[in-house]
């Protein structure tokens, strides 16, 4: 099982909990989601609680993260979009830290499960819908009626816009899930080659050099993907929130 590339994604019950026939067990996935929130919160607290005139390296990282998300939100949704900053920043930090924790050996990557990423995507789309209807009422439906469309084409265009909107949580969740899943499987496969070849003696160890080099390179690539996927998730969230703020644009 140690060399099985799929085994790392297996969810196991740590504390079985069953209420009324429903399974509410505390799993390894639950544990690492809690660990993700705790790690992100601890990092931000420790790096900003004692700010100095000359920022430390970790304080600079926190401030850069803050400004990065704030700039992203302002560019995508304007100054009014800053009311969603706590929401977008929390999502960005959760996805980023979850991705980074998953790179450690024997750690669990929560973002490699479609259930987790789809729940995050539904949270985003749910926020767009709730705020859009709360702020604009039925005027929010103008989002599905682009300006300047000929009347004869309007029903078809509206249908396409509705389908496109409903597909957003699917594309948002699958993008993150698929990238993390594929990357970790590939990394595990090459790491398995290194272990298997190394067990064959001197000749095997010589043959393990190439897979080892690939493993190191893939680890660096996965580190980049961890940041990139957090960025993509956050920037798409900003774009969707812009629709809630300005449905007629």
From Swiss-Prot:
The keyword Membrane applies. GO terms for cellular component: plasma membrane; proton-transporting ATP synthase complex. Gene3D superfamilies: ATP synthase, F0 complex, subunit A. Its main location: membrane. It is a multi-pass membrane protein. The keyword Transmembrane helix applies. One of its GO terms (molecular function) is proton-transporting ATP synthase activity, rotational mechanism. Keywords: ATP synthesis, Cell inner membrane, Cell membrane, CF(0), Hydrogen ion transport, Ion transport, Membrane, Transmembrane, Transmembrane helix, Transport. It is found in: Cell inner membrane. It comes from the Bacteria. InterPro entries: ATP_synth_F0_asu, ATP_synth_F0_asu_AS, ATP_synth_F0_asu_bact/mt, F0_ATP_A_sf. The chain crosses the membrane at residues 26-46, 84-104, 114-134, 143-163, 185-205, 208-228. Pfam families: ATP-synt_A (PF00119). F-type ATPases have 2 components, CF(1) - the catalytic core - and CF(0) - the membrane proton channel. CF(1) has five subunits: alpha(3), beta(3), gamma(1), delta(1), epsilon(1). CF(0) has three main subunits: a(1), b(2) and c(9-12). The alpha and beta chains form an alternating ring which encloses part of the gamma chain. CF(1) is attached to CF(0) by a central stalk formed by the gamma and epsilon chains, while a peripheral stalk is formed by the delta and b chains. Key component of the proton channel; it plays a direct role in the translocation of protons across the membrane. PANTHER family: ATP SYNTHASE SUBUNIT A. Belongs to the ATPase A chain family. This is ATP synthase subunit a.
